[in-house]
Swiss-Prot record:
One of its GO terms (biological process) is detection of chemical stimulus involved in sensory perception of bitter taste. Keywords: G-protein coupled receptor, Glycoprotein, Membrane, Receptor, Sensory transduction, Taste, Transducer, Transmembrane, Transmembrane helix. It comes from Mus musculus. This is Taste receptor type 2 member 38. GO terms for molecular function: bitter taste receptor activity; G protein-coupled receptor activity; taste receptor activity. InterPro entries: TAS2R, TAS2R38.
């Protein structure tokens, strides 16, 4: 007969600290991603055309806003409502499923950005890569629409799988009297849903890794050319290579950390019932979107100019603010 794993609870102070940290990560992520969205939306309001990179960043930041909200809900659910004797409640499974979908959409958009950087920066010498790079540059908006359509299809499939497995789990619970066996069925169903939802991440992961690898190889070739020609260090092509690679490597690192934290949280939740370990994993997952948004802002000239304009406006408002002096009394 199966035996239940001992439940590892956390103290009230740990829950309060976790909620405070989650709220701080949520605030930073919302501010950073909302700033990217507002800057680009303001350009649209002023009827200034957005380039392909701005459109992709706008879509990515909107996805990140949704992602940050889900992670905050996940933290509140875990700290306040989650009973570790029943770790796979329907609400918790729904939040994690939506997080997997939003994370997959952000990966698709990052793959599109990686392909765009590759087509704009890398100087190809063969015919086929030249045609592919030209097609990506000319048809980027159509490619983005196809990616969003594929994301919608993956979302529908993941939600269909989630609701079907939830229905089968409820049905098995009604027909079985063994609580332990019912928990095992719920764990298996959620594990299969996790695998099914992440299968759609394979194509964008491959596209992201291939285009990023091409950029790294191109950077190495460009640096060797610069050394042989003794070029100056202010080469714009070199700077474009470095900015693109910083964006891609940072996204890849944050994505791997987030995915590994989500992967580790599953056995912590289902097998060991360790709420403290799951809290650490969720804190790491919530830090990734906000951290990458900060890197995006620091590496984008348009967003940096917007921050400088805002700071200048605040400083000028402080200087212009009149000082009210009390008039002297007359006898």
């Amino acid at each position: 007969m199966l035996s239940l794993t001992p439940v590892l609870t956390v103290s009230y102070e740990a829950k309060i600290s976790f909620l405070f940290l989650s709220a701080m990560e949520f605030a930073v992520g919302i501010l950073a991603n909302a700033f990217i969205v507002l800057v680009n939306v303001w350009d649209v309001v002023k009827k200034q055309p957005l380039n392909n990179c701005d459109i992709a960043l706008l879509c990515l930041s909107i996805t990140r806003l949704f992602l940050q909200g889900l992670l905050l809900l996940d933290a509140i659910q875990l700290a306040c409502f989650q009973q570790m004797k029943d770790p796979l409640s329907h609400n918790y499974q729904a939040i994690l499923t939506l997080w997997m979908i939003a994370n997959q959409v952000s990966l698709w958009l990052a793959a599109c950005l990686s392909l765009l950087y590759c087509s704009k920066i890398v100087r190809f010498s063969h015919t086929f890569p030249l045609h592919v790079a030209s097609w990506v540059s000319r048809r980027f908006l159509q490619m983005l629409l196809v990616v969003l359509l594929l994301s919608c299809i993956c979302t529908a499939l993941c939600l269909w799988d989630f609701f079907c497995r939830s229905h089968s789990t409820v049905t098995s619970l009604l027909h079985l009297n063994s609580t332990e066996f019912s928990l095992q069925i719920a764990k298996l169903n959620f594990f299969y849903s996790f695998i099914f939802c992440n299968v759609g991440s394979v194509p964008p992961s491959l596209a992201f890794l291939v285009s990023s690898g091409v950029l790294v190889i191109s950077l190495g070739s460009h640096m060797r050319t610069m050394k042989s020609q003794t070029s100056s260090s202010g080469d714009p092509s070199l700077e474009a290579h470095i900015r693109a690679i910083i964006f891609l490597i940072s996204f890849f690192c944050f994505y791997v950390v987030s995915f590994c934290a989500a992967l580790i949280s599953i056995p912590l939740l289902m097998l060991w019932h360790n709420k403290g370990g799951v809290m650490i994993c969720i804190g790491m997952m919530a830090a990734c979107p906000s951290g990458h948004a900060a890197i995006l802002i620091s590496g984008n000239a348009k967003l940096r100019r917007a921050i400088e304009t805002m700071l200048f406006w605040f400083q000028s408002r402080q200087k212009v603010r009149p000082v009210h002096k009390v008039p002297p009394r007359t006898l």
